[in-house]
C-alpha cells in the first residue's frame, strides 16, 4: 500500500510503521487462500540485466467444464521485468504449438537482434524436435531445469500461483476454451499493467520492461525524503 499511495503523491507512514500497528492489533498474519510465499532460486547460470535476455516458460492445466477435462495455458515470462511476453490457451500439449508461441513472442518483443536464453523444465513439449529446431533458427539458447529438481523453474511457478489464486479464478472450471482465453487475457492485462510486483520494487512488469520504472522510483524516493525531513524523529 505504501508504494501505491506514493504513486498518488501521498505518504502516510513507512512499511515498518504499518507492520508495527498491525502487530499491536494482532492483525499481522497471512491472508487469503495462498500459502505464504517461498523464496525461489533463479535458473542456474543465467541472470538478466535487461528485458529480452532471459525468458522462462511453462504449461499449466486449466480446469475444464467436467472433472478430468483440461485446457492448457502456455505462458512465457521475462525474468528481468516479470512481464508476460506471450501466452496461449490450447486443448493439447505439443512442441509444435509451443514453438509457434515462442516465435510470435520473439517477433513481438523484437528480440531477433540479441541473444536470448529460454529456460524451461524437461517436459516433452519443451524438448521436442520442433521446439529445438525453432530455437536454433531464432538463435535462442536453451536452458533446462536440473534433473529431479521439481522447483527449478521458479518464475513460471510463481506466476502460475499468482494466476490461480486471483479472487475471480473460476473454481468450477472454464466452460469453453474461449472462456479460458478471455480470462487469461484479462489476467495478463492486469498482471502486466496494474500489478505492483514485490520482486521488482513494487512497479508493474510493463513499466519495468519499458524502462518507465526509473521515473516512478525517483519520484517515490523524493516523496519519502520529504516525508522524513518533515518528521525527522520518526
Task: Give the label of every model feature segment.
Residues 1-234:
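Charged DNA-binding/catalytic regions of mobile-element recombinases
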Amino acid at each position: 500500500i505504501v508504494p501505491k499511495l506514493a504513486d498518488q503523491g501521498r505518504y502516510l507512514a513507512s512499511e515498518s510503521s504499518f507492520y508495527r500497528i498491525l502487530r499491536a492489533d494482532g492483525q499481522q498474519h497471512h491472508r487469503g487462500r495462498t500459502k505464504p510465499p517461498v523464496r525461489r532460486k533463479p535458473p542456474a547460470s543465467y541472470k538478466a540485466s535487461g528485458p529480452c535476455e532471459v525468458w522462462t516458460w511453462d504449461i499449466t492445466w486449466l480446469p475444464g467444464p467436467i472433472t478430468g477435462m483440461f485446457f492448457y495455458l502456455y505462458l512465457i515470462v521475462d525474468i528481468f521485468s516479470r512481464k508476460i511476453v506471450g501466452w496461449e490457451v490450447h486443448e493439447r500439449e505439443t512442441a509444435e504449438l509451443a514453438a509457434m508461441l515462442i516465435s510470435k513472442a520473439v517477433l513481438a518483443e523484437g528480440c531477433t537482434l540479441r541473444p536470448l536464453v529460454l529456460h524451461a523444465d524437461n517436459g516433452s513439449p519443451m524438448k521436442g524436435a520442433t521446439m529445438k529446431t525453432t530455437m536454433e533458427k531464432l538463435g535462442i539458447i536453451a536452458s533446462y531445469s536440473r534433473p529431479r529438481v521439481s522447483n527449478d523453474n521458479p518464475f513460471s511457478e510463481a506466476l502460475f500461483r499468482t494466476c490461480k489464486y486471483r479472487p475471480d479464478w473460476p473454481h468450477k472450471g472454464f466452460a469453453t476454451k474461449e472462456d479460458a482465453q478471455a480470462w487469461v487475457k484479462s489476467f495478463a492485462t492486469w498482471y502486466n499493467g496494474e500489478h505492483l510486483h514485490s520482486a521488482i520494487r513494487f512497479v508493474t512488469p510493463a513499466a519495468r520492461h519499458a524502462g518507465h520504472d526509473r521515473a516512478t522510483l525517483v519520484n517515490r524516493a523524493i516523496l519519502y525524503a520529504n516525508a522524513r525531513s518533515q518528521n525527522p524523529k520518526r
